[in-house]
Amino acid sequence: MPRLTARRLHVLGKLALGCGALLTVTAPAKLPAATGLGRPSPASAASGVSEKGISAAECTANHRAGTIVFATSYSYAPAASIADVVVAARRGYFKDMCLDVSLQPGFSTDNVALVSADRVQISSLGSDSEVLAARAEGANLEGVLTYGHTAISELITPGDAKITNLKQLDGTTVGIKGALPYEVSAMLTKAGVDIASLKLVQVGYNPVIIDQGRIMALPVYKSNEIRELNVLGYRYKVWDPTSYGVAASFASLVANRGFAQAHPTAVADFLRADIAGFWWAYRHQDQAVAYCEQLVPPQLGITRPVGRFRWRVESGLVIRYTPTKEPIGAIDLSLVKVEYAQDVRLHLVAAGVNIHTAFNLTFISEIYRGTTLVWPKNFAS
């Protein structure tokens, strides 16, 4: 898969990701007891879960799914589509849904082959564009949830470089980690930058390189490097893809198509527990970050302050940019269509993908009543 391989982190990054811990959550042998604190939920849903609990039939069906392996998209960093899953595991939400779940650290594009081969049943990818790219290359997976409906990456230039137009970057050196993010590539192209003229060089994870005269631009995460530069007092200029009308997304969950077809209630209830984990993590940010901190390898440098900033920014973007009258995690095909058309036009993703089969909206529709998650009121929440 040439496009995805080009987007992978360099070897040191992948080694660091592989050092994370495995976390296994085993479902109870019997129907979970309706104990613990909870909040009222809608009376019913299009499955065997209601405010009263989970039906014996659905619990049995979920047991039949066996162990669900979930691979994270960036070790156990407290990011959207990771922190929520970690919380769901630690808080017992998967157990409540009669699911056996095993978490393993990973990197988003490396997970495509694992999910496609059913070695991993559910995983997190970086964006809907990554889902589309995977499908364009024949991956046997489908998008089942999208948390972020905006750009998570942006571009920064040195504060003293006097760059007032992105076109000024033509022929300059740009630092990257793997490859240019989809939304940054789209922004540069929209601004008239000759991408082929850029000298793309692999750089490390320290963003202060933007102030060392070696590069003229650096893609960063809104939820990560910006904090470090601010703390250290560095000056920089931000170029946000959203200001250029770029369609973007982040934190997408995918499932193996065969597994999803064979075990639809297990996939739906995994997402149900995950979204319950998202809301708990949003309300208890310090504890959610602490859960992740216990699993993330120290060499990634994700300290408690760094983790808090990442989760606060990403969870805030998820809520702020969720389309009106749609629930958290919903896949909006109208937005996917725009993002895909943009990717094809800019030669970022191959044409020919059917977005209606690349994404499965059924699971999200089954776990919500309107915009309220169906969750048993006597289960922990």
Regions found by a protein language model. Name each.
Residues 29-37:
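Bacterial lipoprotein signal-peptidase II cleavage site
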Residues 1-19:
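N-terminal export and membrane-targeting signals
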Residues 336-381:
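Conserved C-terminal helix/tail region of periplasmic/extracytoplasmic solute-binding proteins
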